[in-house]
């Protein structure tokens, strides 16, 4: 063993395979089974997570980590009394982990002993605190002392390895009790004998334990005062001054270097073997232990620093400072009854209650092993560090920190003891126990990194005037230190953490620590008191020792900048490396000169360089890390919503005759890319030839290149593709989906293209209005038709901007500045910030006011164009812009979409390559904090200038085509669709039918009936691409589930099966609801053996048991069709349905105005024809008073002989229509007392089949069985909601003719139109005609096309 950390030990180990030495940290924790304890394990793994992302020459290398589980019972005596301090210094003298070897938590295993009793050890010298003192024992006896009550224990342990044991009392002991019972029972016997000795002990300055060491034990918080008073009185009787620890909030300071004691207080020695270290380990009632160990490890609540440097062994606990978030770890679990643990493994009490075995987890972290020493060892050496060596080490530290910060990691505990030195005298930054990942970086860091010349213009000197008058940080009270961020070692901790004057801190906290470290490297201290005083002056007032600034000006400048109290004034690692203040390495100079030569692509060495670069192999850690797969994975429902969103958008684009054209992913760097407004965030890469290539930042530039390269003259295209944003080095670029619609054409047609593009925007906003505004309150919620949808489209024309700026008095040299500043108005800055920025760029207040007058005005497009025409009449350059806008107004008025458009002169979007018309579609999302908040959904414009700039032959630029396009923020729309779906489904399943309802969902008595109908349509709208989900309960039944799924696949049913086990039906239903799956088939082992399956419909929550052989037929009958998929059937208008039913229900009449007279087969106008039924909820016509053989023809309101062919789907949700022997009867007031009620069969579900008679024409015999099922499904949807009498039969003719042919067919006894059809269809039509005449006695006939799977209702023929 080579070291001991805050949660475990570090051992030196040799791998049996490669025979190399490694440092392995072992951390032992409880085996948590409660999910609530998972965050604790995650915190414990923070160091592993941090180290795994780092791989640098000057950072301790991480290899791997693993966890082993074990069941701990009472350990053996040998195991339970492992001496962690006996040979510690011998090992530490050779190993770099020596700094973390001594100062650690209690060595007592929580599972080895059930409790600890109190024992006393007299303490003298400088380590006595408040009379009570710390308990110290030498290496020979290795005794420990426990201070505890029923809920809190304090373990004080120490080690001494040499003759310094004479300073201590080896055979005396003393008890510090915090409980009356403990005091009475255990300390009276020993306290008297120690009274005289105790009086000689000098008082020490007491301090409070910092928030870093406070456990989160909230129990017995109110018992502190009573415990203290009781214990104080008893200790007073024993002649001793004791200190009570209340809820582990108070501690002792053994590090103040008060040398006013007796001559025995000389333990601070130059001899390394005479060193001494004390440790305070605390545990609360829950077993959480916290330790105060080193002179630089605790920030005292009193505001003072423990600065004693008595540890010449350089012991620095490698995890000895803790954030509050680490205080939840439980490392010890003592019972109320306590014992003393001595070196010979004997317990001082006679009985101990055994604890049951507990599962423990041991985390192993394998790291690079470094021998030699630390930077602290070099600093403490006689003579210190040479100036040249100090700069070399500083550069290595900065390079290592630069890598750490580039991974968005803050070390937070940078100090000499945590900077190791390897065999080659190079730096290795280690101890990442307090490092935090993903901490917010200060804004100044971002600004500095994005500024090209920031490094050269860095201000590395800061005046002392800004800090000289400030209150020293040591004057802070207790409250000022009780902050979460209060971590790190005091002398190296930055002011913003100690003073709590900032909510977030970034990498600049490490730069402050670096300043203190560099000062220690440059200045040799003679005594510890001198070190303490000088560092205090340096931190408080930036006061250097006399002569330091004159003899070391470069070092002074660096230190002064690093120790600036303002974090924004401290340089970053990158700025410091490029500042020129650090002497460059010789190899750097050589490399820079070489790069100047080989960077020329025309020489052969350039190819050699590229070849070598691309021959590099990645480190195995990079291969195993997740850095290049860091884009978050999406839920299945998100992916489904994305596909459905793309499908809905695609329908709109296809409706306009566009085609999908994708462009190449990579394209070379060019001047247009470099001037792009988002150029800083473009993802750039190098190919093997040394060409810089870009991933697309947007889809406009790649498309414009495609148009120019392929000489496209006319095109209307759309695309869905990814765009990318640059991430931190070593991470995948951020991926986003974008959709573009573009029109390329001749210049003369550009105005029509502009209007069509704006029409596309309107159609998209209307298509997604429910999703975009579904969560809004008021009239904007719901379907969107009842209230005004608050979206607008702002328009501007760049041809007007120059004229307006000239009108405002802006000089031309400021035009670009104004455009760039105003461009941020609608998404980053408000107008006050824009005005301030313009003033900072040199524009006068009056000019800014004039600009505001124009740019802040917006209004209705047509009206504003008229006003601008008169206002800019004297500016010739505005003529083109005014003319284009007037034409646009006319075109928008022609297609009746003008009211949605506003003219907004402040709209400036991608001015680098857009010219002419630009536009943006936005929605208003006001909040309490920002009532004018808007969100941009689409933007675009005319990019003729971009196409010209990419053209290889500028002389032909006048013949170049023009282009206009719109870009959609797909992710915003997809997220809106997803959120809207979740919102509706949450409401849907809260109001749907449950088993507790007495009436079924279809019953009129069920109050949830209307909600259920709405919810079903909602569920269908967001239905998954999977129709049936096959799963099992109890047993896995993987093979059986595959068989059932295969059975469904063979019938064309979209199905999937679960590969995981479910133990609850509710889990299955919940999964289906979340993923929009309408049906679930549940297999149980015993039921499956007899061929029975359980089927449940998720939307109605109805269950039934189905035989396996009937499963396919069941789903073919019951299949629900998603409104977003290609429906087999389509809805019709309510007027067409009314005409049909009205004509059918006119018993004995000739239709509405027809001439059929009293014919029982009247056609309503003299011609029999076909008609289809469409969906309608309103068809209340007259009652059918008798059951005579009356019939109806195809009548309509226009009283014409022509029939309107209508597609066949109908769904009656709240009506009762009867299919009887006389035809279709609409009976809105049907009741049980009706004369026909006894003959009525009510079908609760559309899956029940109607009574039919089917005649097949042109159908193979083998296919008739399957076709019959399809026909039944079609009829169930066609007559959904109808009631069929027992005596009625629906006649169906199944033919292989196309639906379009059947739809156009007209037949009567006097004439037909068969002659107009092609010869191929005539024979089949004649057969169909003959069958129709055979069934002319029936009121209607259903003709079903198996070719298109659609049906037509054909009325009677006369």
Swiss-Prot record:
Pfam families: HGTP_anticodon2, Pkinase, tRNA-synt_His. Residues 306-333 have a biased composition (Acidic residues). Its EC number is 2.7.11.1. Residues 197-208 have a biased composition (Basic residues). It is an enzyme of class 2 (transferase). InterPro entries: aa-tRNA-synth_II/BPL/LPL, Anticodon-bd_dom_sf, Gcn2, HisRS-like_core, HisRS-related_dom, Kinase-like_dom_sf, Prot_kinase_dom, Protein_kinase_ATP_BS. SMART domains: S_TKc (SM00220). Keywords: ATP-binding, Kinase, Nucleotide-binding, Serine/threonine-protein kinase, Transferase. GO terms for biological process: cell-cell adhesion; cell-substrate adhesion; cellular response to amino acid starvation; DNA damage checkpoint signaling; negative regulation of translational initiation in response to stress; protein phosphorylation. Residues 136-148 have a biased composition (Polar residues). Residues 1-582 form the Protein kinase domain. SUPFAM superfamilies: Class II aaRS ABD-related (SSF52954), Class II aaRS and biotin synthetases (SSF55681), Protein kinase-like (PK-like) (SSF56112). Residues 149-196, 258-285, 342-351, 447-466, 1185-1199 have a biased composition (Low complexity). One of its GO terms (cellular component) is cytosol. Belongs to the protein kinase superfamily. Ser/Thr protein kinase family. GCN2 subfamily. This is Probable serine/threonine-protein kinase ifkB. It comes from Dictyostelium discoideum (Social amoeba).
